[in-house]
Amino acid sequence: MSALRTVSGSSGNGKSYDSIMKILLIGDSGVGKSCLLVRFVEDKFNPSFITTIGIDFKIKTVDINGKKVKLQLWDTAGQERFRTITTAYYRGAMGIILVYDVTDERTFANIKQWFKTVNEHANDEAQLLLVGNKSDMDTRVVTYEQGEALAKELGLPFIESSAKNDDNVNEIFFTLARLIQEKIDSNKLSGPNSGKDGNISINANKGDSSKSNCC
């Protein structure tokens, strides 16, 4: 795997980055999208994170295969009443992370509906990635094998994570950014299934149990 790391400073052309990637996090309310984002960008964890209203976003510049890439990370609300607002942000997204909670089977079952919504509103070339969050919890009801099977069915890369324990959080965003960059470099920008056929699976280690709603 190519070296992936956070970078800072300015390039010779006066910009602090070479390119921009717009990435969305989607999934039911309470699956931990905001906590994953805050852990990645700020390396912080708040177990009582306030539910996102509409849209929020953060920015982080990283090094992808020697290129400085600015990630625009959009955190979308999972509630039904915000769906009309959030789907407008799908267009132009280069990467979309579909998140479910391994302790809540309903959020796992709803991934197929989120996937359908992505196919209806996002660009065909958008790179998708499936994430099972809260892997540290001992109240898990969705197994790693179930997540992996769903990812295979949908043709998506798959990672399990814990924002609380910081398990595989960086891997989520770096893996997606690398897949996007590889697609850009190889000019794979067309076709109904372009960018949706990954075989990457990363299993987070199980940690201590937690009663947090944002793990």
Swiss-Prot record:
Lipid sites, type S-geranylgeranyl cysteine: C214, C215
One GO CC term, this protein: incipient cellular bud site
Family annotation (SMART domains): ARF (SM00177), RAB (SM00175), RAN (SM00176), RAS (SM00173), RHO (SM00174)
InterPro entries: P-loop_NTPase (IPR027417), Small_GTP-bd (IPR005225), Small_GTPase (IPR001806), Small_GTPase_Rab (IPR050305)
Span list, region Disordered: 187-215
Record localization: Cytoplasmic vesicle, Secretory vesicle membrane; Cell membrane
Membrane topology annotation: Lipid-anchor
Sorted UniProt keywords: Cell membrane, Cytoplasmic vesicle, Exocytosis, GTP-binding, Lipoprotein, Membrane, Nucleotide-binding, Prenylation, Protein transport, Transport
BP term (GO), one: protein transport
Any one Gene Ontology molecular-function term assigned to this protein's record: GTPase activity
Chain span(s) of sequence motif Effector region: 43-51
Function: Involved in exocytosis. Maybe by regulating the binding and fusion of secretory vesicles with the cell surface. The GTP-bound form of SEC4 may interact with an effector, thereby stimulating its activity and leading to exocytotic fusion. SEC4 may be an upstream activator of the 19.5S SEC8/SEC15 particle. SEC4 probably interacts directly with SEC8; it could serve as the attachment site for the SEC8/SEC15 particle.
UniProt-recorded name of the protein: Ras-related protein SEC4
Organism: Candida glabrata (strain ATCC 2001 / BCRC 20586 / JCM 3761 / NBRC 0622 / NRRL Y-65 / CBS 138)
